[in-house]
Amino acid sequence: VTSQPERTVREDLLAAALALLDEHGPEALQTRKIAAAAGTSTMAVYTHFGGMPQLIAAITDEGLRQFDEALTLPATDDPVADLLATGIVYRRFARDRPHLYRLMFGSTSAHGINAPAHNMLAFGTAEIDAAVPSFAHLVRGVHRSIQAGRLRVAPNESAEQTDAAVVAAAAQFWTVMHGFMMLELAGYFGEADDEVYAATQILSPMTVSLLVVLGDTPERAAQSLAAALHQA
C-alpha cells in the first residue's frame, strides 16, 4: 500500500482542525479529535506539526490565508468604496467563522495556547503584502484613497513619515472593524441574525466619521458607502 504524501496528511490534519474549530470552538482542538477527523493517528499531529503550539500557529496561518483570499476584491474607480467593501467582507467573514476569527486575532486561546501576534506598525507599505497580507488590503485601500485625493494623511511630512502614517491610518480602520466585531460577536449589539441594525446605527456612522476626520467629505463618504454596500 502506497503511503500518502506528507503534504497531503498535513493538509488533511489542518483541514480537520479548521472544521472542528468552526463547528465546536477551540475546545475541540485536541490531538485525538483532530487525528480521528483526518483519519490518521495522533502521532501524525506531532510528526507533521511538532506539537499543539505549532498546530495552533498553522491553523492561524491558514485562517489568515483564507481571510486574505476573502478580502481580495476587484478594484473599482472609487477607492473609498473599495476600502469600505473590504470592511463589509471583513465583517461577513468574522460573523460566518467567529471561532476562527477570535483565534486568529488572539481574543481566545486553544487550551491556553494563543496564536502569535504581529506588530503591524513595524512594517512599511512596501513590506505589508509579504508580512501581513490580510492587513495589506486596508493599507492599499487607504493609499489608493490618498492618491485619489479623498484622504489626507501627513501631507507635509517626509516620505518615510507619510508611509508610516498610511499604515497607521489603515490600523485606525482595522481598530474600528475589530472593536465592533468583538462586541457584536459577544452579543452586545443584538441577536446574531440581525446584521442590519448594528451596521447602520453603529459601524457605518463610525466609519464615515473616520473618513471625514481623514479628509473626506460627509457627502462623498456616504456615496462611497452606498456603492460599497452594492459592491460587496
Predicted regions: what they are:
Residues 1-8, 19, 119-121, 216-232:
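N-terminal intrinsically disordered/low-complexity leader segments
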Residues 9-17, 34, 59-67, 71, ...:
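Generic hydrophobic, amphipathic alpha-helix propensity
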Residues 80-99, 171, 204, 208:
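Amphipathic alpha-helical segments that line or abut small-molecule/effector binding pockets
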Residues 12, 20, 24-54, 58:
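Helix-turn-helix
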Residues 190-232:
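Charged, low-complexity intrinsically disordered regulatory/assembly segments
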Residues 111-175, 181, 199-212:
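Amphipathic alpha-helical packing segments from all-alpha helical-bundle domains
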Residues 96-122, 182-190:
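Amphipathic alpha-helical segments used for helix-helix packing
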Residues 63-85, 112-128, 153:
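Amphipathic alpha-helical linker/stalk segments
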